Swiss-Prot record:
Designated name of the protein: Beta-1,4-N-acetylgalactosaminyltransferase bre-4
Organism lineage string: Eukaryota, Metazoa, Ecdysozoa, Nematoda, Chromadorea
GO molecular function: acetylgalactosaminyltransferase activity; metal ion binding; N-acetyl-beta-glucosaminyl-derivative 4-beta-N-acetylgalactosaminyltransferase activity
A single GO cellular-component term on record: membrane
Positions on the Cytoplasmic side per record topology: 1-6
TM region positions: 7-29
Subcellular location: Membrane
Disulfide feature: C103-C144, C215-C234
Cofactor: Mn(2+)
Described function: Catalyzes the transfer of galactose onto proteins or lipids. Required for susceptibility to pore-forming crystal toxins in conjunction with bre-1, bre-2, bre-3 and bre-5.
Length: 383
């Protein structure tokens, strides 16, 4: 009889151990999608559908959780920097409290329209406002396991006031949405023509080496969200987030626009080969992105205009970001060149990587002279 009780006890212990191992395996290799069983019938959401239902129905995480290794011209980021991020994830993937649950499918504290902060607190003040943010601008919920791991990629140069305003607004929003996130500021070195698309590719490459992100949101520094229901999460299809901007009277300037803020999974970025590296100066890279998205068999999705709303910070034209006079010639060749222009041929030099309290700062040399020399082969009259 005693032997029988002992056998039953051992069997129960074995079953509990198996359950724990299955849970850990699931959390590492396939954290459940927010709404992986939901689908949408159209790539563009219709305005007369209930706004929040439309958001939820178009939210999913379909990419795997494993880090990818892209070929680049710089060595893998040091173990010290990787460890700084990975230490944060250990208690999430292997919690001491095995009863820790995933966060609610709908974040519980969303209110809809929110205050947009236009003041410019200094960095020390911002650190006091957001004390729970980890090194590198890495935030995550404390009382539940985040359902999404999101890297915010911001191309940047010489706009510190805008950066502080954006950080103030984004950290407030992203914490409320219960995301596991970090903000990456990808800063181009001085004395080069600004290249937004290539900075996006570099941001993706650097961020992917630090942490197993599922979703990448490419975000202009001068756009501030006006509604907290605009979820910064992984889309089923690539998503144009900045649908309604005050500068354009909250209307799309044209139907094919894919600029401002875009959200793509790792799988999407692989399929479209990232952004073009060849648009030096203002204009062209966002329309090129729309074309390569279509060529890869994907569609651009949007949330309803009453949710996907943004305020744009006013700014003057920058001397280092002149209008790209060759943009139309390059865009005319996108269908021919997109598979060999992007992540697949990305070349840059990582000058500095710094985990600041509110963001990760990556300073990069985009090797403009070398790239322009190569471009002359395809566009001899432009470069």
């Amino acid at each position: 009889m005693a032997f029988r009780h002992l056998a039953v006890a051992r069997l129960k212990s074995l079953l509990v151990l198996c359950a724990v191992l299955l849970l850990v395996h699931a959390m590492i290799y396939k954290i459940p999608s927010l709404y992986e069983n939901l689908t949408i019938g159209s790539s563009t959401l219709i305005a007369d559908v209930d706004a929040m239902e439309a958001v939820l129905g178009n939210t999913a995480s379909t990419s795997d959780d494993l880090l990818d290794t892209w070929n680049s011209t710089f060595s893998p980021i040091s173990e010290v920097n990787q460890t700084s991020f990975m230490e944060d994830i250990r208690p999430i993937l292997f919690p001491d409290n095995q009863t820790l649950q995933f966060c609610n499918q709908t974040p519980p504290h969303l209110v809809g329209p929110i205050r947009v902060f236009l003041d410019e607190p200094d960095f020390k003040t911002l650190e006091k406002i957001y004390p729970d943010t980890h090194a590198g601008g890495h935030g995550m919920p404390k009382d539940c396991v985040a359902r999404h791991r999101v890297a915010i990629i911001v191309p940047y140069r010489d706009r510190e006031a805008h950066l502080r305003i954006m950080l103030h607004n984004l950290h407030s929003l992203l914490a409320k949405q219960q995301l596991d996130y970090a903000i990456f500021i990808v800063e181009q070195v001085a004395n080069q023509t600004f290249n937004r698309g290539k900075l996006m590719n570099v941001g993706y490459d650097v961020a992917s080496r630090l942490y197993p992100w599922q979703c990448f949101i490419f975000h202009d520094v001068d756009l501030l969200p006006e509604d907290d229901r605009n979820l910064y999460t992984c889309p089923i299809q690539p998503r144009h987030m900045s649908v309604a901007i005050d500068k354009f009277n909250y209307k799309l300037p044209y139907s094919a626009i894919f600029g401002g803020i875009s959200a793509l999974t790792k799988d999407h970025l692989k399929k479209i080969n990232g952004f073009s590296n060849d648009f030096w100066g203002w204009g062209g890279e966002d329309d090129d992105l729309a074309t390569r998205t279509s060529m890869a068999g994907l569609k651009v999705s949007r949330y309803p205009t009453q949710i996907a709303r943004y305020k744009m910070i006013k700014h003057s034209t920058e001397a280092t970001n002149p209008v790209n006079k060759c943009r139309y010639k390059i865009m005319g060749q996108t269908k021919r060149r997109w598979t060999r222009d992007g992540l697949s041929n990305l070349k840059y030099k990582l000058v500095n990587l710094e985990l600041k309290p509110l963001y990760t700062r990556a300073v990069v040399d985009l090797l403009e002279k070398d790239c322009r020399r190569e471009l002359r082969r395809d566009f001899p009259t432009c470069f």
